[in-house]
Structures are given as structure tokens and as C-alpha cells.
């Protein structure tokens, strides 16, 4: 990791205040907050329209795996089958399995699935590598202060178009992926591009990240038709990031962006009701306190299995990390082949749609007169076996697919797996105790419990399920399920699946204070003065600056009082480079040349030129006494958002502690957990694992 990979939030706040007038741009009669509010509203409208388009396209492509609409080939199965016969049959939709032999219909089903998976891999990995996977882990790290190597690639028109199409094909292929996580990346891409229309507004790292947080909220809101849940989702993700207090100002932008996206989505749905995700779930009866123990059991079971999914997913990620580009493509095709064969077998035997986008609403809804699936027409033990089998297969397929070379999301697969587990348990209990709540309620409880175990979210999930299902009468069971599931999963695996991927990609990520514990004193790896490049504050020669730039890759240099070890401050590498580039014109440059030559000749002549660095010192330098308790040092990094801290001994430099060093230290502690001190690497004493969990 490099020192310049993280943002110094205090310095950014300083620069923001200093350049407020410059950021005002051409529309000076509008305040900055008004301009960013307008950007949030405009972006939210585009996000809502994009969500409507992608939902419709994904649903249409998904229908082609089963057949096509004879009335209009551009109608998906749900639209085509809006009117049923007296026998609850859909005559307008041409099903492959009803009009061809088993072999031919299976061949068509599998071929379409594999073809869609290949297209998704080509678009989301070969054409635009930045479009692969979920996007939420990287965006969460960016919001925490991570400087993505090339933001203009991660947020670009090419990435936006490729990921938008790729996520539709990946979902339509039947793979166990969701589109909600990738859509968060799509939403942040939209707001980033809208902000870039006004370059004067795009210079602030703080405001840019506040808008990205608003887009994250809007992406979830548009995906689930849950504006309040989207806002809380973004806030809960930001609460576990470094310097979360910085984003308190983003709540307003999140609300505006989420509300405008859902309004745009609802306007489209007003004349095309099938656009969007779920709007309402029918639960068969109310719950009672007799259901509390089964709810607790389901929550514990989902907490354990969610941790198993994270463990297996990271194992698959480690195995496929060294794959070539061709190998990654073939791996996705192989997953699609296995998934489609399994789905077709389950579809033929039980009429159960084995893909998370359709399985989840099937499982959490009560049986209707038109229901012909195994959930409603067979004995309880057959239903339970099919549901448990579906959950187990879904868990294995999701753990192998999430993070593969296509746009992948974890939210809907987790909901589907948990719903199968919950309804299976409810079915078994209902057969023995008829007075218990309906099986669909158990499905909802299982879905939120499993999702909580994989993402470690609590409040956001409860609100999203409220808005998604309309089931306000099960508020208490939902809250109980998320809490128990999170506690259980925290005790098994420390990180959420998002933070596990942040660590897997070696992205520098500094969690919040709630994610840290201290059992014994810490010994942080402090950089000694001998390890640092030191420059004099007065009469610093060009040769010293050039030597510092050449001999060190550090993002900062230490400035000391001349001929002493007294600390004066930090100077950034960029500032030194800037000084060297404009040294002939620097007003703060002192020269001893008195030859009277013209500037061009003087620049090429041997001149003893020096700089006074006082005016170029980092204006937000933080210092502490060298014997300050490490807990307080860590608190300063977390609460102030700084990246470098100078440790002094009576004004003299004792060493420098950086945020990157703390992150590396924590990783080494985690690697050697359980070892004796004699087995740890030399140079630093690792006394405890300071990261208890990376997502709270």
C-alpha cells in the first residue's frame, strides 16, 4: 500500500473552505448546497429511469429462457400472462417445455442461459473490466477515503453502458446473482457523470463523495422501491467507514436523490405496472408470541449459514484469483451450465423457478388459487425437502458466483436462500402446530436474517423489508431476526462479505471506532526519523528537493528547523514537485547569482538556488507527544480523518505514524492471531488484533 492512497479529510475540509468562491462557478447567485441539491435531483431522475429500463430488459431476457410471448415478443412473461384462463393457464406465452420434448426444451433453456452468461462476461469483464463484480465494496472504500487509481475509468460512460447491459444478461442467465449491488455502481456512475458536467463543482473530494453516498442510497431505493430504506442503507454503510461524521451533510442529498429516483420509477410504473421490483407481499396470517422461539431458531440457523457463505465465497475467490481472462470466462460459462441444468430439473419436477429473482417472491408469498408449485400442492415433508435443497444449492452457487467475472450482487440471492430456509422450517412446524403463523411469514423472517448475516446490516434491512412487503405487522420479529443473526455471524466471521472483498483486494480501508477493540496496550509501527526524508525549513536547495523526489516514494516529507531535529511540519510530494516545476518564477526562491544574465541564461547557468519551505508546509499538520497512549492516537485518526501524525519528544521529531501503517499492522495482527510473540515477524511487537470486525 502507498501513503497517497487515502484522503486526508481535514486537509480536504481546509481546501474546501479556502476555495469556496472558486467552486461557486458561473451561477454565483446559487449557493453550493443548492447546486448539489439540483445535481442530486437530476441524477435521481436518471437513476429511476435507468432502473425502470433495466428491470424491464432483465425481465424480458429472463422470459426468453422459458419461451416467448405470442402476442408481442417484446412482452415479458409477467406482462404476457396478466390475463389467465379459468384453469389459471397462460395461453399467450409459448413455453418451450410444453411444446417441445424434454431434451429439446432443456437444450434451448440451457443454451439461452449459457449464451446470456457469455454476453454478460464479455460486456462486464472483457470490454469493461471495471464493470465486474458488485461495486459496493469498492464504492464503500472510496467513500471511506480510498483514492481509486483511475476514478474516470471506474465512473465512465463505457463502464456505465457495459455494466448496465451486462447486469441484465447476468440476471437473465439464471445465475445466482442480484442486480441491486451492481445497480449501486450504475447509480454512482450516473451521478459522477452528471457532476462532471460542471467542472467547477467536481473539484471537491468531500462533495463528490457526498453525492456518491446519495447515489448509493438512490440505487438501493430504486431497486427495491424503498426510498427510506435506501437512505438508511447508505447511512449504515457510511457509519462503518473512516470519519463518518463527515457525511452527515449527505443525508439531505441522499433523501433528494432517493425520492426523485422512486418518483421517476413510479411514474413509469403508472402506465407499465410490471416495471420495478416487488411492491407488495401477501402474508397468510398474523404472528403470535408462540412463534418467537421458531423465529430465534431460524435467525441462528441463518446466521451460521450466512457465515458459511462468506467463508466459501472467499475460498472460491482465492482459488480463481490467478485465473487468466479466458479462464475467468470459461468459469462463468461452467457456472451457468451447472446452474441452468439444476434450474431446469427443479422447474420440471416442482414448478419452482430456481433463480433468485423469481424464487424469492414465490417463497415469501402465500399460496393463491393459481399456484401450482411444490410450495402449495404437496405434502409438507416434500415441500420442506425441496426448499432445504434449493437453499443449499443456492448457497453453493452464490458462494461460487459472487465476485466472478460478471456484475454480481449478493442481496437478492441472500434473500432467496433465507426465505427458503425460513419457509422450510415454517412448513415443518406448521404441520405439527397448526396454530403457528403462516409459512410465508417464516419465509420473510428467514430472508432478512440471512441477508443480515452476509451484509451485517440491521436497521436498513428492516426498513427495506417494510417498504418491500408492506408487512408492518411483523416489525418486532424482523428486528429480532436481524439482531440475532448479526450477533451469531459476528461470532463466527468478523467481517461482512463487502468488507471481506475489500480486504481480499488489498484496498486500504480504515473502519469506524465501533469496529475496534483493545485488550492490551498497542505498539504501532512508527517510522523513525532515519526512515524519513527530512528537509530544512530555510534555504532548502533544489538539489535536496530533487534528491528527496528521486530517493523516496513517500507521499510526504518532514520539514525540520535548520541544523536541528525540531519538527516544523509536513510538505507533500505534490507540493515539492510543483515547486521544482516552477522554480525559475518562484517568488519565495532565493538566489545568490548576481551576474545580471537574462532569465533564460540564468536558468541554465549553475546557480545556488534555495527555497524557504515555511509557506508550503501542510496547513493541517497534527502532532502528539511520543508517549501518548496508542488508543488516543487511533481515535485521532478515526475521528479527525487525518493520514499522518507526527510524534514529538520536547518538540523534536520522534517518529511519524501513518494511517496506512496502522492498516498494515492490523492485517499482520489478524494473520498471526493465535501465535505466540516469538513467532511474529521482527521489527514490530504485535500484541493484539485491533480489528474486531470491519463492518458494524
Swiss-Prot record:
GO cellular component, one term: Golgi apparatus
Alphabetized InterPro entries for the sequence: CBS_dom_sf (IPR046342), Cl-channel_core (IPR014743), ClC (IPR001807)
Transmembrane segments: 38-58, 107-127, 215-235, 245-265, 292-312, 329-349, 380-400, 402-422, 433-453, 457-477
Membrane topology, as annotated: Multi-pass membrane protein
Keywords: CBS domain, Chloride, Chloride channel, Ion channel, Ion transport, Membrane, Repeat, Transmembrane, Transmembrane helix, Transport, Voltage-gated channel
Top-level taxon in the UniProt lineage: Eukaryota
CDD domains: ClC_3_like
Sequence ranges assigned to domain CBS in this UniProt record: 527-587, 617-674
A GO molecular function held by the record: voltage-gated chloride channel activity
Subcellular location: Membrane
GO biological processes: chloride transmembrane transport
Main location: membrane
Role according to the record: Voltage-gated chloride channel.
Name of the protein in question: Uncharacterized chloride channel protein C887.02
Organism of origin: Schizosaccharomyces pombe (strain 972 / ATCC 24843)
